[in-house]
Amino acid sequence: MSESHLSNVWFSVTPLEVASGHGCWVTTTGGEEYLDFAAGIAVNSTGHAHPKVAKAIADQAQRFIHAQVNVFKHDLLEPLAAKLADLSPGAIDTFFYANSGAEITEAAVKLAKQATKRPHVVVFSGSFHGRTHLTMAMTTSKTSYRAGHAPLPAGIFVAPYPSPLAEDQDVEVARALQGFDHLLKSMTAPDETAAVILEPVLGEGGYIPAPPAFIHGLVERCRAHGILFIADEVQSGFGRTGTMFAVEHYGLEPDIICMAKGIASGFPFAALGTRRELDDKWTKGSHGGTYGGNAMGCAAALATIEIMSDPAFLANVNARGEQLQAGIRELQREHDVITQVRGLGLMVGTEFSDAARVAAIQKHCLEEGRLILMNAGTYGTCLRWMPPLVVNEAEIDLALAAFAAALKATA
């Protein structure tokens, strides 16, 4: 493929040009098939070209493609909101739509500032919230996401996130919470802090589930100070961790929840969920967007939710996640370069002691195993597993076999 007219700003982890995809597989223009465990960076939740999603999009395109919500409402907006209300944790019952994770995260911050009349936001080390100017300022997983764009917006403060590699996790959680407390004493007073925004499982930061004591400690502090708790479920939501949202593992109800990626099986769509009384504090007309709540995206999201509503769907996510982690742990016994295996559902991270080894394994898996994997983490030492959630037992076995071969070949 000639790329002479494409921007050079995109970074690619493979040189592949894809002609089609089905389920967990993609086929290149050269006719080669690859097992896709990148899934559009955890986006293709129901796999490539799921027939129900494809039909929903095609059927909607025959009715109308775009109906701008500031001009008139279309007939899928409310049905989707009702479905999301049924799925969302706690009393979340009101929804705003956008196109991407970064947009919806920025919307969450705007709502939090208007609702609380406070100017500041707290994020955490290792976080990723997007690539707009505001969300870059909120992103701390890698300098490459921020470099060359200063000055970034002010009013963003970074608190420590517990390291999963610390030997004593109780001590590590206490250290991180003390760091948060210190931040509220030294840099952003509680009455100036609108919100805390947290990924329940760090995404780009290395697929690190938040320790329960840490996330509960944060929520307790937020409640005590009137600080809104925003759950960034852009990557961890819609079944990725084995529950519809990762906060369900912790029994938590966020004030605001950010949804994107897997919500529409690959169609650009995002949603913000909150309680009606919070949403009512958002000044009418102070936020919006041309394509937010677009009819095609709503159709894709409704079809995705229908697929995920089958109890067998999440049961498969949990079973395949257990199979995947068990297989990696078995290989860990033979290869001490793997320092940790962690994750929830099909959001699994494999930590290595050497970033160069991770890159070599990715390369071998792609070229010899026809398996697409991506890395994560500040130092690039985490190999992340994020297959489509429809992956089956045989496909997990194929991926593990390719990974095992790569471990041996790169030793």
Predicted regions and their residues:
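Conserved N-terminal phosphate-binding loop of PLP-dependent enzymes in the Aspartate aminotransferase
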Residues: M1-A411
